[in-house]
């Protein structure tokens, strides 16, 4: 199981993501603070920041941007993925400062990508929903879905594969084509319970078990 960081370190990263976005929306400046955790400056994992709007008891994606294979170090990747999620996701208008009180920040730390080199028909047997994220690549096309996505949608491995292909702007069955490369990875995910509130580490295996009941 990929868990490189403590809850204290994960909490720092989520707080950092929110703080740099608030600073950027207030002043237009991006500031990379110092870290009391040396690992965050030496590790170079992939990082994604996700921002979700709260609507009653439901959450709606507001922005998600990241670096699948890292950017300088975990600290820098968190800072710039947070700015990307708030203001550079082409699917959404830029986040407004007044929205900060009604959005949740989530930071996902990605393990190195692992290329699957088996018969594509065996992919559904290998992929574990609640553990794996997927990356599909073929020619100039690529698509990534984080491990929490199939859990939140309660997808089967086959549905997860199909939607990752679609994310790459490829046919839904592209994963069966041997010209398509499929990578799996794991992620450690830290999330706010409420806007600016307590941070916890998500347990996707338990979440997926609940969705199947």
From Swiss-Prot:
The taxonomy runs: Archaea, Thermoproteota, Thermoprotei, Thermoproteales, Thermoproteaceae
Residue ranges that the Swiss-Prot or TrEMBL entry lists as coiled coil: none
Give the domain of life: Archaea
Span of the signal peptide:
none
* Protein name in the entry: Protein PAE0745
> AMMECR1 domain spans which residues?
8-201
């Amino acid at each position: 199981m990929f868990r490189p960081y403590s809850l204290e370190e994960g909490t720092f990263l989520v707080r950092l993501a929110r703080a740099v976005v608030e600073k950027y929306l207030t002043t237009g400046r991006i500031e990379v603070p110092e870290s009391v955790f040396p690992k965050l400056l030496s590790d170079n994992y992939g990082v994604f920041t996700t921002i979700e709007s709260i609507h009653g008891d439901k959450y709606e994606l507001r922005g998600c941007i990241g670096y699948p294979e890292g950017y300088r170090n975990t600290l820098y990747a968190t800072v710039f993925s947070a700015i990307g999620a708030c203001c550079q996701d082409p699917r959404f208008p830029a986040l407004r400062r007044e929205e900060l009180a009604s959005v949740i920040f989530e930071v996902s730390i990605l393990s190195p990508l692992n290329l699957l080199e088996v018969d594509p028909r065996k992919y559904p047997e290998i992929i574990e929903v609640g553990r794996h994220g997927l990356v599909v690549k073929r020619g100039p096309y690529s698509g990534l879905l984080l491990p929490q996505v199939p859990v939140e949608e309660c997808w089967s491995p086959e549905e997860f594969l199909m939607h990752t292909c679609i994310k790459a702007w490829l046919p839904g069955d592209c994963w069966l084509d041997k010209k398509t490369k499929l990578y799996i990875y794991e992620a450690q995910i830290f999330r706010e319970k409420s806007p600016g509130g307590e941070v916890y580490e998500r347990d996707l295996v338990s979440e997926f078990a609940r969705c199947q009941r």
